[in-house]
């Protein structure tokens, strides 16, 4: 049976007890702060939007107990719906009747001037709008082009109907002040309408049939609730794809399973975009059909592919590399006829020498040198010395994961030996 501790301070120690109470208080504070940030949220069990509550009191809210056995009492906070005041019927808010060209007639009482009228109205409006009162709608017979318009006093002031529009700068200041106060009051009114909308929603699960209008905030919550499952599945698929293809292009975000594939993608896709716009535009004007010719390789009478006489990246020929400004021999694909400078292709010295000894293929036409097929290109390994491609499952013994660092095929290891790029990295 558990032992009752009558005096926890004596059993645990004064300092330990104070620290425990302080930790408990800080934990509760953090928990309440975190919950208040997430409010309002849609309860998945009841479908009700949970708002902040007032059950959390502080020490300064304590009062003496009122009933027997009460140690403390806290002030009650009753729910109160925001009241909307009806437009007050105040005679001071009504515009005086303006009768132009009658103040100078003999026998008539002279009315106040327009400047005095606007100044007086601005003072009255500021006084009443500061108390959150709303102006009343009055019928104001303002003559404008022979028509009578009915509007509120504020709208009449803002539109300037029945009043001459030619005023000095000092006379325009009160109207600008009225407009500023009106805009602030309208913004506050919109916020109050949204709060009342949340309070007026019936908290019932059984609703009548039909398609009642769903509030905007609830549509957002329902959309988030519905989309959580699909988003989780999409995130799982994306994480699996990230695991399968760890090499990411930092320019376009395309992923590859091995580093050689990423290198070829960068060389053939983004290297040309780093060139100057002027050089590309100039070459486009001089040879506008070059880009179209790349997609359809030209064949000679004997059926042999005719290679392009310009680099696919810098658009220079064999007589000049526009990137380095020096002449350089072109390397052409045996399948599509595309050409490129070895430096533009980021070839090493071993690659530049090796591609002259066999029918080289570009990255779009690359196939396995053992089986001769180009399928499963994500399984292709490219030699860092001769640029040949090999399926990982076609190698002997098969390779299940792309090796880290440089990799050389069996031909280059036998031919180059210690000059091979992967010398010392492969067993």
UniProtKB/Swiss-Prot annotation:
Residues 233-244, 279-296 have a biased composition (Basic and acidic residues). GO terms for biological process: chromatin organization; nervous system development. Expressed in the heart and somites. A zinc finger (PHD-type) spans 308-368, 365-415. It holds the Pfam family DPF1-3_N. Residues 184-199 have a biased composition (Acidic residues). Residues 182-244, 272-301 are annotated as: Disordered. A zinc finger (C2H2-type) spans 247-270. GO terms for cellular component: nBAF complex. One of its GO terms (molecular function) is zinc ion binding. Component of the BAF complex. Interacts with acetylated histones H3 and H4. Component of neuron-specific chromatin remodeling complex (nBAF complex), a subfamily of ATP-dependent SWI/SNF chromatin remodeling complexes. Belongs to the requiem/DPF family. PANTHER family: HL01030P-RELATED, ZINC FINGER PROTEIN DPF3. The PHD-type zinc fingers mediate the binding to acetylated histones. This is Zinc finger protein DPF3.
